[in-house]
Amino acid sequence: MRVSQSLVPFAIIALVLSFVNAYDPSPLQDFCVAIDDLKGVFVNGRFCKDPKRVDAKDFFFSGLNMPGNTNNQVGSNVTTVNVDQIPGLNTMGISLVRIDYAPHGQNPPHTHPRGSEILVLVEGTLYVGFVSSNQDNNRLFAKVLHPGDVFVFPIGMIHFQVNVGKIPAVAFAGLSSQNAGVITIANTVFGSNPPIYPELLARAFQLDASVVKELQAKFGSI
């Protein structure tokens, strides 16, 4: 699928706006290109590559023009561009994803523990939303998006997207972290390793323990 060139600026705007409330530490130098050092001490972020060895490829990624494979259980694919793909994002407080959705495909309820998200729809029709905290009575904020529409998901809030159209959908999203993380709710609760006690989940979700065990068997294999 070819992404409409006229809507590319919206994706760029999403990235620029993600700078405003970046949650990662601000850099204290021009750049700090990430480098993996198994012999080093763990730090909150990444070690810096010697600036004299930094080159253009440390700030480059290619491939967001290519659709992701949505032939899976949820009918979506997230192509992530964070510090793991672009080491030069280290300390920059931003990252980017492309999300492809098959018709009726979804990005299931999940959270990003370390970053807010701003999403721009490029093709198709999405129903998107997030749920506020217990303190706010778990209110649902949701909208149907069309090409060019933008929606924000606050940091830590459970949110989702589902393709409600008859054609594939494409969205881009900027996140206010070099590695925002993702916690998919169903996989985390029912697919933890080792499993959470079924009796605990049965009472928490008001389900029969046998149903919980069935869900654990399903999500534990993903």
Swiss-Prot record:
Residues 1-22 form the signal peptide. SMART domains: Cupin_1. InterPro entries: Cupin_1, Germin, Germin_Mn-BS, RmlC-like_jellyroll, RmlC_Cupin_sf. Keywords: Apoplast, Disulfide bond, Glycoprotein, Manganese, Metal-binding, Secreted, Signal. The keyword Ribosomal protein does not apply. It is found in: Secreted, Extracellular space, Apoplast. GO terms for cellular component: apoplast. Its main location: secreted. Disulfide bonds join 32-48. The keyword Transmembrane does not apply. PROSITE patterns: GERMIN. It comes from the Eukaryota. Glycans are attached at residue 77. Residues 62-213 form the Cupin type-1 domain. Mn(2+) binds at residues 110, 112, 117, 159. GO terms for molecular function: manganese ion binding. Pfam families: Cupin_1 (PF00190). Belongs to the germin family. PANTHER family: GERMIN-LIKE PROTEIN SUBFAMILY 3 MEMBER 3. May play a role in plant defense. Probably has no oxalate oxidase activity even if the active site is conserved. Oligomer (believed to be a pentamer but probably hexamer). This is Germin-like protein subfamily 1 member 18. It comes from Arabidopsis thaliana (Mouse-ear cress). The lineage of its organism: Eukaryota, Viridiplantae, Streptophyta, Embryophyta, Tracheophyta.
